[in-house]
Amino acid sequence: ETADMDQPRGVRVAYASGYSRVAVTIAAPEDAVSIRRMFPDAFIIAVHTTGITDQEALMLADHADIVTSCASRAVREIAGRKALLQAGSSIPVFAMTRKAKDLILDKVKSTDGQFLVTGAKLPSESDFGPQPLV
């Protein structure tokens, strides 16, 4: 057998096994589109986005719940503008859906410690992020 990563197949197996709350990390934007089409309730987290194209960033913004920015210019510019919430500034994580926004805010509420919450036009930039963005 091979050790290939097939995220849509993994989500299909999870639902077929009786799981009703399924989350998946994806690195290929096409997987986000495929999974969202087949399983609208799946929670999709896009990772490893450095170097993706503008079109791929748009696919993630339209189909993933959370998009990590890594060192991606396209994610910051495209997903960042469409995001409902941005967590972090050096390596932003963008909540693209209401359930992603709620998840991040619930994590903040349940965590001890201090947080800065401010309103801003997204994406909000930091002087400490990776350079260059690709």
Can you describe what each PLM-predicted range is?
Residues E1-V134:
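Conserved mixed alpha/beta catalytic, RNA-binding, or beta-rich assembly cores of soluble enzyme
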